[in-house]
Amino acid sequence: MLRLFGAQSTAVGKTVENLPPQWRAAAQWKSRGAETLVALQAQSPSGLKKAAQALRQAFSADLYGAGETTLPAAVVEALERHDKLLICADAAAGALLEARLENLPGAEKVFDFGAVSYANPKTGPLIEKRARARLPKDCTDPLRQALARAQAARRVVGADLSAACAERENDRVLVLSCRKGCFLRTVPAGENPALWLLDIIRRTAANKPQAEGTGFLPARRAAKKDVLPSPQPKRHPLRRVCMTLLVLALLAALVAVGAWKYTNGNFYALPEQLRALLTEHVPRPGATLV
């Protein structure tokens, strides 16, 4: 049994269908939300091994475990293996992670459960103060606030990864700050934000590509107060046509200037001079081209 998160079920089905027939392997898969379980069967151990290896290679970033491995356990294992410390920048992110990581072996070594971050009586207010300093005074956008908190918490605590959550009316935006920048994902109300946040953490800790739909804000842009791109001004529909006509007019003007100089101001002599110029370069009978 292979466990995937963030893989497209259609891609899984296509990969299974393309398994070489000589392996004599078959697979059944079931998707629930963003998670997909794949059960492999084969008539020989070698065929089963090859089929499993093919799926592992095709979905190396989506694969988080096998057998009874859970996504939270895979996150703890990835943090431990790559020596990463994870914290939460706010209570919303803490509510998503703490209940799922508690009681897991080794979790307290890689996750603070709020002890030195947002829930700490000294560190928590300092994180909020640093976050407010990064924002305009009149900013009320929950996403900008979550981005600022995630970055401020990571720097205040000195952690490798800092998670935050922007709660909005119809969705939540998950934020994970790392040294390179911030990963962001919008999760609709019907999906499980905790699992998506765990998956983002797992992929970031293991330096694996994120699932489709997870965005990234580089550190230089994330460090600016105006972190989100402003709407692009609408261009007039005739702007491109006008620009094309202007370029053509400039080219015509350049041609006219060149013709004026070539004919010494006598445009009527231009056809005759062009005809003479072409005649000079036409090979005559018996001539040898060099």
Regions from the PLM with identified roles:
Residues 1:
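Conserved anion/nucleotide-ligand pocket segment
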Residues 31-36:
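Short Gly/Ser/Thr- and Asp/Glu-enriched loop/turn motifs at secondary-structure junctions
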Residues 280-290:
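Short extracytoplasmic
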Residues 262-282:
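Ser/Thr/Pro/Gly-rich low-complexity linker/stalk segments immediately outside membranes or between
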Residues 46-243, 248:
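Short alpha-helical segments enriched in small residues
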Residues 252-261:
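Hydrophobic alpha-helical membrane-insertion segments, chiefly the h-region
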Residues 5-26:
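Short amphipathic alpha-helix segments
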Residues 4-6, 38-44:
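Short beta-strand-to-loop capping motifs
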